[in-house]
UniProtKB/Swiss-Prot annotation:
InterPro entries noted in UniProt: OMP/PagP_b-brl (IPR011250), OMPW (IPR005618)
GO biological process: transmembrane transport
Domain of life: Bacteria
GO CC annotation: cell outer membrane
Localisation: Cell outer membrane
Stated name of the protein: Putative outer membrane protein RC0105
Family according to the record: Belongs to the OmpW/AlkL family.
Alphabetically ordered keywords of this record: Cell outer membrane, Membrane, Signal, Transmembrane, Transmembrane beta strand
PANTHER family, per database record: OUTER MEMBRANE PROTEIN W, PTHR36920
Signal peptide start-end: 1-23
UniProt main location, coarse: membrane
Length: 244
């Protein structure tokens, strides 16, 4: 899945070169046209764009830094969490046709893998632990990105961005605590504009996130044990937007 999304991102980025040329020609046609309504050009005079998106979250959640197991027969721990879902709301502020910044607040859910928690308990001397019901990991990222809109003309407008996020992390999973994290964000997407100041948005963001995990004594024995987890969630979203 990750490879497919990355390939699609490369295709989108390369295709923007030709899109920019085509869109610029449409922009020139509008300037010279006597009948505005007959031209295939979607004008956007708004400097603010508000978007609401829903999407899927792809994450491998690989752990690193676990201590040497105390069990004489350790087992593979595997991934502590798996793919999930989420959404966000954002405001994009345009400084000119090409440059903008996006502020967003999201809410994402990652499914925990209790087989991984059971493996940790086994490796550190607590067998037959009662894990209870599955409790997910919640990720609430506040993100700021700087964007370059490659072809800010016409109805199809791709963009790329880079930024930073701070994420509040929470879980009620038995014996597990996850700390807050932060890191860089890469972004690529495209807006499909209509003539009534609305748009459809497809957005792909790669979050770099390696928060600390704390395993509580009821899961690993007499003391708290910490490790790091390589979440690095890839969020693929689709949504609707409005210009102001």
């Amino acid at each position: 899945m990750l490879r497919i999304v990355k390939k699609l991102g490369i295709i989108l980025f390369v295709s923007t070169i030709s899109i920019n040329s085509f869109a610029k020609s449409m922009y020139d046609d509008v300037d010279s046209a006597s009948d505005y309504d007959s031209t295939p050009y979607y004008e956007n005079e708004g400097s603010l764009v508000f978007k609401m998106r829903l999407g899927g979250v792809v994450s491998s959640a690989k752990q690193k830094g676990l201590p040497t197991p105390t069990s004489p027969q350790p087992v593979s721990v595997g991934e502590v969490a798996k793919n999930g879902y989420g959404g966000d709301a954002s405001t994009t502020i345009f400084f000119n046709n090409y440059l903008a910044t996006e502020l967003s607040l999201g809410f994402n859910v990652l499914r925990t893998k209790y087989t991984s928690l059971a493996a940790v308990a086994h490796n550190y001397g607590v067998d037959n632990v009662k894990l209870g019901k599955h409790k997910p990991i919640y990720m609430i990222p506040a993100t700021i990105t700087g964007q370059f809109h490659i072809a800010p003309y016409g109805g199809i407008r791709p963009y790329i961005g880079i930024g930073y996020h701070g994420s509040y992390m929470l879980t009620q999973a038995t014996g597990l605590k996850i700390r807050n994290g932060h890191g860089a964000v890469g972004q690529i997407g495209v807006d499909f504009y209509a003539k009534d100041d609305t748009l459809i948005n497809i957005d792909v963001r790669q979050f770099f996130l390696n928060p600390k995990l704390e395993y509580k004594p009821n899961l690993v024995g007499n003391k708290t044990m910490t490790s790091k987890v390589k979440l690095n969630p890839l969020i693929v979203s689709i949504g609707i937007g409005f210009t102001f």
